[in-house]
Structures are given as structure tokens and as C-alpha cells.
Amino acid sequence: MSYKHIEIEKKWQRYWEEHKTFKTTEDDDKKNYYALDMFPYPSGQGLHVGHPEGYTATDIMARMKRMQGYNVLHPMGWDAFGLPAEQYALNTGNSPREFTKKNVNNFRRQIKSLGLSYDWDREVNTTDPAYYKWTQWIFEQLYKKGLAYEAEVPVNWSPDLGTVVANEEVIDGKTERGGFPVIRKPMRQWVLKITAYADRLIDDLDDLDWPEAIKEQQRNWIGRSVGAAINFPVSGDENTKIEVFSTRPDTIFGVAALVLAPEHELVKQLTTPEHENEVEAYIEKISHKSDLERTDLAKDKTGVFTGSYVVNPVSGEKLPIWIADYVLNSYGTGAVMVVPAHDERDHEFAQKFDLPIVQVIEGGDVQKEAYTGDGVHINSDFLNGMDKEEAIDAINNWLEENGVGEKKVNYRLRDWLFSRQRYWGEPIPVIHWEDGETTLVPEDELPLYLPKATDIKPSGTGESPLANLDDWVNVVDENGRKGRRETNTMPQWAGSSWYFLRYIDPHNNHEIADYEKLKEWLPVNLYVGGAEHAVLHLLYARFWHKFLYDLGVVPTKEPFQKLVNQGMILGSNHEKMSKSKGNVVNPDDIVEQYGADTLRLYEMFMGPLDASIPWSEEGLGGAHKFINRVWNLLIDENDNLRDRVTTINNHDLDKIYNETVKKVTEDYEAMHFNTAISQLMVFVNNAYKADSLPLEYVEGLVKLLSPVVPHITEELWSKLGHVGSIAYAKWPTYDESKLVEDVVEIVVQINGKVRQHLQVSKDASREELQALALNDERIKQELADKEVKKVIAVPGKLVSIVVAK
């Protein structure tokens, strides 16, 4: 008969809640294990079946570690600030606060229905003032150390949205969401100096157990490159110099022109009157493009000549100065030297605008395409005949000796744009006074509360909707000096950059978390989440953690020791699940129809955890069938334990049971859940064939299954006569000696042809094997009337008999 999943799952979820089964233990004599999920943004759509995949993976690890005797910290919370709630509020007139609260309650209900073993006493919410007090406190420490500053920054401004959007959110000059026009304009922004940590953010990746692809993405994002800064004097104005950064200063004899970013500070000064209109029109056109569009390698190169020239400081040659959108002011110095013969982008630019192509490294046909390989230098004066490394050293020395350049390290990474012109975010705790002074809100006055507001429409001035709240914005100090609060709010990344610390000590009113507790739990042993967070969230969290380490607030240099990315669950048509495609599967429906245990088992059995796999109703049915097989193996039609479950062991299952304990334990540790489940299926198949089921092995099976299917195993555990939860039952161990068969199979050959298979003791000697083979009835018949010339026995393998032909 089928087990009653709805009844059983509700019963045990109630039990866990009432008994606080998963409350974090902090026993000094136990080791600690911190299993962390990337906390979700609580959207209006609720959970989809992609969420439980990662959550179940960490839950399996947390449940196994509890049973192995660890203190386990396994928490959940909400990354609840953010644009979608604000957009919803603007569209409907509802409060983002109420909308978020409703969504959080729905997410919590759904997560609890999946049987995930979270310690709900440690729940955090980034919109809770008791939480964002510490987000604001971290900002204040960054400000005090000079790592938070204000700057006029060119940003992607969307007048319709009333906010800045990130480069990644601009496509063809319009916002990704809504298709609103975007313009580039300088705005006062708060910026965090993440570049101060660039080297450490790269170098410390080597010590982390993370997927290599993720580490490489972070290295590329930071983009450390070693090169030279070279000063090109402007022709006719020797006092004005343009600094260029190049990773290949050895190609300086092949420079055909200098290209500046349209935003470069010298563009106006360098543009001659006859080129003014053309340059201004070009700059206006570029203002509608994001940095990503500008640097797209596939697009046509564009540019305009300024009318001015520089002098090559090494060769003395006069070179034209152009501006082009593929050069970004935010990278390097905003000026590049164009070497058409040896750079594909420069080659395209030179061909389009008829610039000379001078080969300075031997190889290829540079008139047709750029040669980017290695070779000896030619047409390069004192560098001729040198290879790349020699030439770079030689030119760097020459530049320094002649005072026109120096060796330099450059980074692709830009400082972190930290302000948003929105309402639904953490207020930045800063006051701007009428006399020009800027001060922090005193620490003892934190949190600076986000005020309640009914009108959260964008201000239209480039400020956030908070600018409309006069009573909140305007302040007066004790001396009558007037000031205005900062009206920008923090980005959604802020609260998620440190939440893993708060779980360790979530109710501490005096500090982020007690240092001794942080020492006990950090770094996080296992962090599971989507690969789409490979760069920004993980980079920002590492930056804040390193800063807090420097302050002495946290005891480790890195927050997450091991990172695992779960794959994506696709629609049954192999496409990404989305509302617009109508292929989203709601976990509530699956839990209702099949049960949470089936959903958990199916998602872990679909394939490797990091693979992207299509959803299959058939696979779901198969998982449900297996759970019923386990139930019916042990429970009879009257809902009682079967008589086959006995304290007597006839040893039929010894080998397969011990193999199963070994393989499942090792596979869980390696997070190879699909192969662990396969092994459990093999054991269940063997158990069905056995005459009796030893109680010890039945209990072991139930324990091994419990991290994956916790509800049914709790029920089976109680049917086996245990009081209380299986959650802290001792994890099974295996007997190494039982993994080795006492009996092995050998073959008996006559003149090279196999004539018999014999079961023999694994320790049988040569003489014993020969005797067993020659006395076997079938072999005797084969040898009748034949002369045996030789008998060769190989222990554990074969007996070979040679007879006269």
C-alpha cells in the first residue's frame, strides 16, 4: 500500500517546529559545520522548483553532519530590499513594506513545506532595522577609513525609471526591463573603494575550494594586468601630456595614433575649431550607449579625429589624436595607443580610417590581419632582434631612464557604485550641512530608519523619492546649522554582503556578532547557490569581509571556504523556466500531489548537482515509486513493521549493506547525491530478495535515506520503536572486513577453453585449487580417457589443465 505523504509530512513538520529539533547546538566538545544557502529575494511569484535543488543539497549535508556528531549551523533569511518591490508599489499604489512582508511569509511557508532543517530562530531579513543598523555601521567604518567617498561619476541614467541602471542592464541604449531610454550623464554618487583590495581579492582565491570557472571569472573581472604608463607630449604644447597604459610597451614603434575615450578630460582642449561640430555630435551619440555596447568586439568601429597630434616619446614621430567609443574612460587612463599590426581591434580601426600599419613583430601578413603571436622585434630601433620579454624589460628601462614612463599594474575592476536613487533600500547614514561639511549619523543613533512614505515616485531631479520627504530630509543641529540627509539609498548588494555573519549571532544588539562565536563558525564550510552570482555578490561579500578582517571584527580573511553551484532546472522543453514561456513548475503542486520527500529525492537523483537538466514528470513518478518501495519493504498492509525485520542476521546482506554505507557516506561528502541514491536503490532491490532483514541493516538504511527523504524516514524510525527524531541518531559505519568476499569465483580451463566456474575460498592454495578442479564432476567427465600433461593453478583466478591432443 502507498504511504500517506500529506499526513506524514505535516505530522513531522509540526513535530520539528514544536520541539525546535534543528536549533543550533553549540557544544564545546563537538566540531562545527556551517552549511549556507544563498538567501533568496522574496519575489511575488514565490519559490519555483529551481530553489529546492540547492536548498536540498545543503540540507542533506546539514542532516548528515548532525548525525555524525557535529554542531550544525544551517540558517535561512531574506534578501528583501530591491527594485521589484518598489516597482510593484509604484504600479499598484501598495506599500513595498507590506508587499515584501507578504512575500516573505509565503516563501517561509513554502520552504517549511519542503522539510528543510533550518534553525528559524536565526532568521534574518535585510529590511529589518535591527539588521540594517549593522549594514549602516559597516558603511560608516568604510567612510572613516576613506573607502567610501562621493564622486561625480558618468552613469547610465534612466529618466523614466528615475534611477541609475548597471551596465549589464542596458541593451541597445534602453533598459533591459521595460525598454526605457538610457543616457550617460555625470551624477553625484557614493562609491566604495573596492580597488584598494584588488590584489588580495585575486591572490586569496588560490586558497579556496571553489569551482575553477568561478575563480577565473573573478580574476577576469578584477582584470589585473602588468604594463607601462607612457607619457605622450601634445605636439605644439609640450607641457600637456597624455598618459597611456599599455601591456605591450614593446610595440611602441608601431603606434599609428592615440585614441581617447569621448569622456577624456583633455578632449575639449585638444579639439581644433574645424573639428568641433563633428566631435560634439559624436559625444552626444555615444551618451546613449552603455559601456558593454561600446566595447562589443563584433560591432563596427567608429571614431572622429580631434585635429591635434602627439609626439611618440621614443621615436619622435607625430601621431594623430582620435576619439572612439571603444575606449572607456574608466579603464586604464582613458587613452590607448593604436598598434594596428598587432591588435585586432586596432587593425579594424586603422583599416576603417586609413591609418598606417607598421609591423614591429615578425610573423604573419599584417596588411591583411593583425599578427598577435610572438616573434622577434623588427622596425624597432634598439629593440630589434629581441623577443617579447627582453623587449618589454628594455623599453621599460628606457622609459624610466628618460623620464617618459614607468612600469605599472592596472586593473579592469572599477570602484563600486554604491548609491541608488530609490526608496526601498537602506538609508545612507550621512548628513550634508549648509556650510559644506559632511558628517555621519552618530553610531549610537543607528539605525537611521527608512521613513514610511505613501508617495515613493521618483523625484524627477535625479534624487531618490526620499528627497520629497521634507520632515525626514531636513535637519538642524544644536547650533541651528541646517543640513540635509543623504537621499540616495544603498544597493541590494549591501545587505547580502555580510548576512552570513549575522546568522552566527542574530540577536546581538552591541556588535555584528560576538568575535568568539565568529571564531567558532567561520569560514563557512559549504556555500551553495547559482553561478549567476559568480562575480558581483561573491566579490562584494569577499571585499566587505576582508575590510572587516582588517578592522578586527572577523577572524578570517575569507568568508566561504567551499562553494558549490547547483545547475539550472530547465522546462521539460529544455528551455529556461519563465512565466512568459508558461513552463514554470510550482513546488506547492508537487508537494501536494507527490510529497516533499519525492520532490527532494527527484531533484537529487536527476543528475550531477551542477548540471542543467530538464524537468520530467516521469522522473518524478519514478522517485515516488521508489519511496513507496522502501515503505512497502518494511511496513505491511496493517501499517505495522513486517515480520521479515528481525534481530537475527543470516549474513546474506553483509557485503551489500557495508558497501552501501561506505559508498553513500563518501558520495554524500562529495555531494554526488545521484550516485548515492543509485546505491540505496541497489540495496533496496537486494533487500527485497532476502529472506530476512536484520534490524541493524534496516535502521542503517533508514538513517542513510533520512537526509534526502526526512519525513518518511522519521515515520519509519518511530515504527522501528524509537522515541523522538532520527535527526541526531548516530550515522552508520561500515565494517571493512565485510567488504571483502570470503568466497571467490575461479574458472577452470582445459586447453585454454573455459569448462567450469567454481566457488572457492579466497585463501585456497595452489594445491587445494588443483585438487578441487580435478575432483569436480564435470571436469572429471571432460578428462575421461584423456592424458593430463600439466595443471597450472593461479590462486584467486583460475586453474588451467593441459591435456594431450
From Swiss-Prot:
Domain of life according to the entry: Bacteria
GO BP: any one term: leucyl-tRNA aminoacylation
Annotated positions binding ATP: K579
Compartments it resides in: Cytoplasm
Motif 'KMSKS' region: positions: 576-580
InterPro entries in UniProt: aa-tRNA-synth_I_CS, aa-tRNA-synth_Ia, Leu-tRNA-ligase, Leu_tRNA-synth_edit, M/V/L/I-tRNA-synth_anticd-bd, Methionyl/Leucyl_tRNA_Synth, Rossmann-like_a/b/a_fold, tRNAsynth_Ia_anticodon-bd
CDD domains in UniProt: Anticodon_Ia_Leu_BEm, LeuRS_core
Enzyme Commission number(s) from the entry: 6.1.1.4
Catalytic activity annotation: tRNA(Leu) + L-leucine + ATP = L-leucyl-tRNA(Leu) + AMP + diphosphate
PROSITE patterns: AA_TRNA_LIGASE_I
Intervals of motif 'HIGH' region: 40-51
Keywords: Aminoacyl-tRNA synthetase, ATP-binding, Cytoplasm, Ligase, Nucleotide-binding, Protein biosynthesis
Gene Ontology molecular-function annotations: aminoacyl-tRNA deacylase activity; ATP binding; leucine-tRNA ligase activity
GO cellular component, one term: cytosol
Protein family membership: Belongs to the class-I aminoacyl-tRNA synthetase family.
Protein name in the entry: Leucine--tRNA ligase
Organism: Ligilactobacillus salivarius (strain UCC118) (Lactobacillus salivarius)
Lineage of source species: Bacteria, Bacillati, Bacillota, Bacilli, Lactobacillales
